[in-house]
Amino acid sequence: MVRRFCEGIAMHYLLFYDAVDNYEERRKPHREAHIAYARAAIAREELVLAGALSGPADGAVLLFRADSPAAAENFAKSDPYVLNGLIKQWRVREWRTVVGAAAEVKIHW
């Protein structure tokens, strides 16, 4: 049985970044501001995990825990990487986690 969640209960959201060419080199002047911005989101208990993709380094994935996708969307809109043109596009997807200690909806067999 899958337990359904009521509105207002935190869920997981993935923020996907598609980066510009030569992203690793071009991010250097903005990295400190981006990391500080991410740490502030962690302190607010919105951002759970984040990091660049590798092989190739052409984007990043950020995991949020929030009541709505707005936390991830607002993060992207003000992220120094986005504001400085390092991210070609971004998108937020709800991630319905079902297995694991931090899963929001647990499957019981």
Locations of regions flagged by a protein language model:
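Conserved, structured core segments of small domains
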Residues: V2-W109
